[in-house]
């Protein structure tokens, strides 16, 4: 599914790919929700793909691009940071579902958090240093609050 969405301050060309089986498909958010979450965190214009994957693909990508041999919740790939940002977010549905259950969070809220988190990474935010982490977490919390979701760090 691909669609252009425009807000007063941002234009988003979004493709959502679902490389997952029926069980994970049932647990994954709709394209409309993904678009809503991405736009809420976007400052400027972007062309991006959100790819929802299973554990095997998530593990392979994390190993190949980060040198870590396990599936992680979200991976961010930035391709262009000019006037129109271009990049991909890859979310591993079984990992996101497992984390939500382990942390006692609603699955939808956890997906929203990870899309917002990934969108901030696409725009250059990071959390390696403590001051960067604080800034990024504050932004995530603010964006999620505007969407009606609780603070993911509380």
From Swiss-Prot:
SUPFAM superfamilies associated with the record: Metalloproteases ('zincins'), catalytic domain
GO biological process: rRNA processing
Cofactor(s) needed by this chain: Zn(2+)
UniProt: Zn(2+) binding residues: 117, 121, 127
Pfam families: YbeY
UniProt gene name: ybeY
Family (UniProt): Belongs to the endoribonuclease YbeY family.
TM spans (from-to): none
Entry protein name: Endoribonuclease YbeY
Gene Ontology cellular component terms for the protein in this record: cytoplasm
Organism: Aromatoleum aromaticum (strain DSM 19018 / LMG 30748 / EbN1)
Keyword DNA repair part of the UniProt annotation: no
């Amino acid at each position: 599914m691909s669609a252009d969405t425009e807000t007063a301050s941002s234009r988003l060309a979004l493709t959502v790919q679902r490389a997952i089986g029926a069980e994970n498909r049932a647990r994954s958010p709709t394209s409309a929700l993904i678009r809503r979450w991405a736009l809420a965190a976007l400052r400027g214009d972007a062309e991006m793909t959100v790819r929802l994957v299973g554990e095997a693909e998530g593990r392979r990508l994390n190993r190949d691009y980060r040198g870590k041999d396990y599936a992680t919740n979200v991976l961010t790939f930035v391709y262009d940071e000019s006037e129109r940002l271009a990049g991909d977010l890859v979310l591993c549905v079984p990992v996101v579902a497992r984390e939500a259950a382990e942390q006692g969070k609603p699955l939808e809220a956890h997906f929203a958090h990870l899309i917002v988190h990934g969108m901030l990474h696409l725009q250059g935010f990071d959390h390696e240093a403590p001051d960067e982490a604080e800034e990024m977490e504050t932004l995530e919390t603010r964006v999620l609050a505007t969407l009606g979701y609780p603070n993911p760090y509380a």
